[in-house]
């Protein structure tokens, strides 16, 4: 799927719509600095949790038993079985996504069963992701579930829960990221796990983070943890 510059994509609230890329698929978001792609709510008066956000599933490795996991919110399988020759691809390419904004997304079905603004699930290092914003998301702004994807020039604004989150052995890079916490319903700037069920699971999470800026809301934030980590 290729989305041209200047396109607006509307997510339907009633059906809890989300844009899901299955393993082997590619999404190219071809926004530009002057003409970005916008993914937003179809509601006349938009609000967080109006739709499900962007989910990318790939063939890179995880540290879960068997190597394959099923995405929260029934968003499909991701990862790979290391015992199957040629199935795992650390350089898996799920497309090129640049100059776009995601607004009013994220769905909380139940605790630990939620959709993020952007979910990179078993995504490989061949995937390109830069110059994006996640705005007013119900759950995490961006979460990496294992894999080796990298991203840069990201802005996470007013996201509930955590702005950046990872688990299941993420091993990518992130640079030039600005986080502005939601003053009323945020958790942490970053939540970092190797694997909640087994802290020694391999491959271990080992991302490299550079040039992060965190902005809290200590004046209005009664419910926000206002924490960096």
Q: Regions from the language model: what does each represent?
A:
Residues 1-229:
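Beta-strand/loop edge motif enriched in small/polar residues
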């Amino acid at each position: 799927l290729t989305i041209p510059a200047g396109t607006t994509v509307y997510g339907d609230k009633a059906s809890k719509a989300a844009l899901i890329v299955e393993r082997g698929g590619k999404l190219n978001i071809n926004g530009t600095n002057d003409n970005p792609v916008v993914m937003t709510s179809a509601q006349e008066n938009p609000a967080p949790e109006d739709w499900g956000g962007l989910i990318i599933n790939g063939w890179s490795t995880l540290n879960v038993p068997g190597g394959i996991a099923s995405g929260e919110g029934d968003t499909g399988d991701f990862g790979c079985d290391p015992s199957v020759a040629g199935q795992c691809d650390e350089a898996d390419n799920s497309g090129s996504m640049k100059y776009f904004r995601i607004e009013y997304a994220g769905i909380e079905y139940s605790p630990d069963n939620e959709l993020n603004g952007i979910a990179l699930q078993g995504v490989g290092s061949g995937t390109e992701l830069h110059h994006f914003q996640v705005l007013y998301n119900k759950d995490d702004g961006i979460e990496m579930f294992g894999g080796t994807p990298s991203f840069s020039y990201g802005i996470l604004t007013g996201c509930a829960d955590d702005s950046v989150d990872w688990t299941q052995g993420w091993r990518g890079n992130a640079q030039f990221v600005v986080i502005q916490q939601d003053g009323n319903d945020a958790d942490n700037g970053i939540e970092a796990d190797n694997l909640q069920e087994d802290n020694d699971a391999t491959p271990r999470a080992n991302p490299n983070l550079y040039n992060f800026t965190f902005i809290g809301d200590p004046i209005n934030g009664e419910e926000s943890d206002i924490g960096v980590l």
